[in-house]
């Protein structure tokens, strides 16, 4: 399950799932970070993409906002279907799957929808300069923003004390299928679901 992050921001206290208040970019300018979030080292790799030293001393941050590509490289199963090696979907079409067998690597997309929860919204560009409404990922959006609360009451950086980012992923429901039965698995039915994620900071 490979995801490409293009921007990582800290959100100040008062932020919600729908709003990153006074966002502070802590990722490198003009660079992206690909993470295989199914690997055991995923949390460390994702965490290293952000530089906590950029945080304001004494400011409480309670959410993180991640901008990432809608395109994922995925291997897995959903319902009666499995991903098929070499298959590629698009923003407007799911990828073809297979019934049973060993899952192969497919290119899947987070689908267009106006009914996501408010912690997600689409973005035309990689830096979130032009975004859709909360809960909406539209046909012109190449990326999406994802807001997640920071566990343990948030992050407040002290002078000379920069904690380590810990990101725990759950990809058990990362692959989605839109069939309703094994007979349709070979059609265009495979898409990307959002992964489960827990974000914390440790000294």
Indicate residue ranges for each PLM-predicted region:
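A short, solvent-exposed, low-complexity linear motif enriched for acidic/polar residues
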Residues: 1-203
């Amino acid at each position: 399950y490979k995801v490409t992050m293009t921007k990582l921001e800290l959100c100040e206290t008062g932020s919600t799932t729908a709003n990153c208040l006074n966002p502070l970019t802590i990722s490198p300018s003009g660079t992206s970070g690909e993470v295989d979030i199914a690997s055991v080292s995923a949390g460390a790799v994702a965490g290293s993409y952000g530089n906590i030293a950029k945080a304001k001393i004494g400011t409480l941050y309670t959410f993180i906002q991640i901008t990432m590509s809608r395109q994922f490289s995925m291997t897995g199963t959903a319902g009666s279907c499995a991903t098929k090696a070499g298959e590629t979907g698009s923003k407007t079409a799911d990828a073809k799957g297979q019934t049973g067998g060993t899952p192969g690597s497919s290119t899947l997309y987070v689908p267009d929808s106006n009914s996501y929860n408010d912690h997600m919204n689409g973005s035309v560009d990689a830096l979130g300069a032009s975004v859709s409404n909360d809960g909406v990922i539209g046909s012109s959006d190449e990326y999406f923003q994802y807001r997640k609360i920071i566990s343990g009451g948030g992050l407040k950086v002290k002078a000379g004390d920069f904690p380590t980012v810990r990101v725990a992923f759950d990809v058990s429901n990362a692959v989605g299928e839109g069939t309703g039965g094994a007979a349709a698995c070979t059609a265009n039915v495979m898409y990307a679901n959002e992964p489960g994620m827990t974000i914390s900071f440790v000294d």
